[in-house]
């Protein structure tokens, strides 16, 4: 057990890398990965995005793979794009890494960041990474599925088929003492143990997503439809997404520019709010687009 998915990643990276090793992740990515990885002594490097689908950009990924890469950090369903990596994508990732392990003569671990695992929309293919790749460490948080983000409760799950799985589990038990990511308090652990296999009502997220997606398309935004999470990641109406989001503030719209996610020219919208608030926000969005961009 760890203090959320952040603690899980902090543990996992220290188990499978040493200082100076490279960890690859894929844009768009959660910006806090930088301190999680770099503070461990490993070095985070970011593979450019495939903005047509926000699936993995395999051409750029294979260009960046080298013998110093010891881990690949993925996030599916993804923050900020809302995209879920397909079974085809995960199978291809596994195939590439299996070949590179053999070529380089060492293991390459997937660190699978999965806090949004239960927030999957109807009909979306959402594979478990560990089913397709033995050297997988799954990093999970209960904060999204049970709507308890402040409780900081998660875990690292080591695939039993992973190389030296028993050693990695033992390492996780010791790492807490050195990182400050101590085990969560016993009371929330006890509470969550009584909620296993359950979630809060997550259906509102898909309702909100469909409302926002349809409106964005109607207004002329370029956007890939999310398959999960409570985020959507449209292309901004000008190249400078920071300027775009600053203008939106005048209309009481809080949008997050994409620069910190490793992509230029996009922005993130979150819709983990009541549907009534989503509908009211669209009135402001229409006004913003009309007055600032004549659309």
Q: How would you label these PLM feature ranges?
A:
Residues 2-295:
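PLP-dependent class I/II
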